[in-house]
Amino acid sequence: MKVLNFGSLNIDYTYQVDHFVRAGETMSSESLQVFSGGKGLNQSIALSKAGADVWHAGAVGAGDGDFLIEQMKKAGVHTELIEHLDGQTGHAIIQKDPAGQNCILLYGGANQRITREMVDRV
């Protein structure tokens, strides 16, 4: 099966915390992990691992977006339809507490700069 997925690409910065930061509070985290993420990217990788031939379309920013493209290539996803745009790649700042609950702050970055013309080219 061949799949074309046009979806978000984000870098997830996941911080392990004792509790979620409250208004006015500054807190240190216990650890930081960096993951590839975004609903679209996650779907493409899952489909590829399940045996589908997947092409992903979307956008990343200059520089740090290459990390996401490499992760997708390692999973067997075709990345030729991903555009590199000026500015930052989308990212999420994720707080994760000991119970496994999370709080997420999302910056859309390049995902928010996708144009109708880019969609039409795909």
Task: Please state what every model-predicted region is.
Residues M1-A57, F67:
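Glycine-rich phosphate/adenosyl-contacting loop at the front of the ribokinase-like
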Residues E25-T26, K49-V122:
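Conserved N-terminal subdomain of the carbohydrate kinase-like
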